[in-house]
Amino acid sequence: MKKTAIALLAWFVSSASLAATPWQKITHPVPGAAQSIGSFANGCIIGADTLPVQSDNYQVMRTDQRRYFGHPDLVMFIQRLSHQAQQRGLGTVLIGDMGMPAGGRFNGGHASHQTGLDVDIFLQLPKTRWSQAQLLRPQALDLVSRDGKHVVPSRWSSDIASLIKLAAQDNDVTRIFVNPAIKQQLCLDAGNDRDWLRKVRPWFQHRAHMHVRLRCPADSLECEDQPLPPPGDGCGAELQSWFEPPKLGTTKPEKKTPPPLPPSCQALLDEHVL
């Protein structure tokens, strides 16, 4: 498991010094009926909605990065989740990266978030709204111990667990990625109501936020869904494997060349950028 500082930096690092991808040259959503195209890690979106940055229930971080675009289903999910959180007195929901105006590949920080169906949400629920300065330069609250084996008790709360559970119980949500230690704590705390845990998937980093992914909309015919998570709550051998030391002889996988774009996404780039 990577050290805390490196893990958090990977999510919050500024991309200003990296070469822009063609998708970053598209500054407004592409007109048309909303269509998520391709896969979460190789796709785009037509007709994206803009998440309103003003809301009583949530706040949007790093608005200067302009990553608050997504499929209308994603915008409605964020509004729905944050309203439920407010009704339960959990606090203000802090919204991180969604996607770019036309989706597509980032120049760093994300492999997915390309079809307008992904959103990062801080696992903090402030009772007092953040200032503009705090939102522009958010400070992540690392919930995981240095050795990566458990959450930090003084930072974990039932409210955080409730927020994750609310998101997982939403019918549009297909996966929620969190650090393995966070998944482990959810497993310990869940009690008999465990069906929602199937959607909560352990993944590298994700020590301070959850990454929520929605299913492909029914009318997005070129959208590629992932297979459903394995049956069960995911709290057994699969989860424990994340805490085992790496096998001898394993090497870091080589960086792969990005696959060709879906034809509709390439056509979108050809028309609007190239």
From Swiss-Prot:
Disulfide bonds join 44-265, 187-235, 216-223. Its EC number is 3.4.24.-. GO terms for biological process: peptidoglycan metabolic process; proteolysis. Binds 2 Zn(2+) ions per subunit. Zn(2+) ion 1 is bound in the active site. Zn(2+) ion 2 is bound at the dimer interface by residues from both subunits. The keyword Hydrolase applies. The keyword Iron does not apply. InterPro entries: Hedgehog_sig/DD-Pept_Zn-bd_sf, Peptidase_M74. Gene3D superfamilies: 3.30.1380.10. One of its GO terms (cellular component) is outer membrane-bounded periplasmic space. GO terms for molecular function: metal ion binding; metalloendopeptidase activity; serine-type endopeptidase activity. Residues 1-19 form the signal peptide. Zn(2+) 1 binds at residues 110, 113, 120, 211. Keywords: Disulfide bond, Hydrolase, Metal-binding, Metalloprotease, Periplasm, Protease, Signal, Zinc. Its cofactor is Zn(2+). Zn(2+) 2 binds at residues 147, 150. SUPFAM superfamilies: Hedgehog/DD-peptidase (SSF55166). It is found in: Periplasm. Residues 225-274 are annotated as: Disordered. It holds the Pfam family Peptidase_M74. Belongs to the peptidase M74 family. Dimer. Murein endopeptidase that cleaves the D-alanyl-meso-2,6-diamino-pimelyl amide bond that connects peptidoglycan strands. Likely plays a role in the removal of murein from the sacculus. This is Penicillin-insensitive murein endopeptidase. The gene is mepA.
